[in-house]
Amino acid sequence: MLNVARLLLVASILIPPMSSSATEGPAAKASKGPTTLLSPGDLLYLGAFAGPESVIPPDYDEWAYGGHALTFNPEGDPSGPADGFPGALFIAGNAQQDTVGEINIPPPIVTDDFNELTRAGILQPVIDLTDGLLTATCVACSTCDCDNWDMGGLQYLENIDRVAWTIYDWYNAGAEDLESLGWTDRDMSSASGVWHIGQRPNDLPDPFHNGKTSDYLFTAPATFATQYLGNRRLLSGYHRESGALGGSQGPTLYAMAPWLEGNPPVPGIDLDAIPLFFYRWFIECTDNQFDFCDFDGYRVDDQWGGGVWIDAGDAMAILLFGLKGLGDNCYGDPGVECPTPACEPGRGYHSDPYEPQILFYDPSQVIEIVQGSRDPWDIQPYLVYSPELEVFDPDCGVLSAVAFDREHGLIYVAEQAAGEWGDTAIHVWQVVATLFADGFESGNLDRWSGVVPGGAEKQKAPCN
């Protein structure tokens, strides 16, 4: 097993960050904002642990095929060991059941074998965190099929000691613009909601349609939110396939502060929110005429599942995690209208091949959008990093929900269905101020990386 402490010691040698799997975005430039920009070299990969165990099919238990929503609870697991990973995680269970539970955080390990991972323990069993509000919202929609409704995102709000959550209709063929946000006490009781994120003009295109706002949740740094966002610290976003029916052809981000509109706000209201970025919809973009796309490299089957806004000393960045399509867009049955895919065998949108990606956005450009000097769709990641060596499935592994222990700089990222029976893996990165060498005893300083390698097969290519 690798000695992480020794790797951190090597990190005291300062070398400019570089990675063969990181590419500079077309909009990359020096930050005009209050900070410098983070790079993949500022993220130290610590390994992974496994979610609670699932049973063999067809009797999947509550935890199989979950992990699509995640948030850090700093007050969780108070009697846990002092192992450097305090707190706990609220995490979505089986996606078909729309439930959430709470697990502890065991120390991660670096391995290519999922079965070697330490299992998280269950602190609170899975329940309907919305206490029936998801079902009630769906039933009130005449064109909705409740089988298509999902738990979207989770975010613990320390300032009000509540767990915020989103719900949404992933199919939504009627483009219904329904309420999507609520919150629950930390003990997973007393659900309140549901509220709409932003104003509803009910005309498409709509900057606040729930097809853009109702999935992942995370928070902006408090000082940034106070200075630039009018104290709107809670962030949300959603990228649905193809971006149609109120969606965005690219990832989105919105800011709000529902606690300023009531404790709790009145059910059904339109919350005050502002767009930080989204991308317009063009039919030509779905038809492989990519010059029409606002988001560079957009594909209809891109999947962005979570994010984190990092502030580390004088460095800052907004990171979004997901699975990125690299091939042409196609809709239909594999082997009929579309080529036979490696990842999704069913009828629908395809953009094979795929790779896991982390998008790095510049907060200074978000400031320009909020202040009105830049359009919300006139923004690109300044850097894209593919953690293909860190994930268990570098071709089809879905990096989904993200949680952040801001005090300790620990990022938790779910890789869905990483285990044989749909078990979730939780990858852990730590934000560090310095870089480290490849971690091998040879002391070879020609190779540098933002990951902890697990052996020769984990080694990054040398920088050019």
Predicted regions and their residues:
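Serine residues within intrinsically disordered or low-complexity segments
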Residues: 19-21
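Intrinsic disorder/low-complexity segments enriched in polar/small residues
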Residues: 25, 30, 442, 458-461
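Positively charged n-region of N-terminal signal peptides that target proteins for export
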Residues: 1-6, 70
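Extracellular glycan-recognition surfaces and repeat-rich motifs
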Residues: 445-464
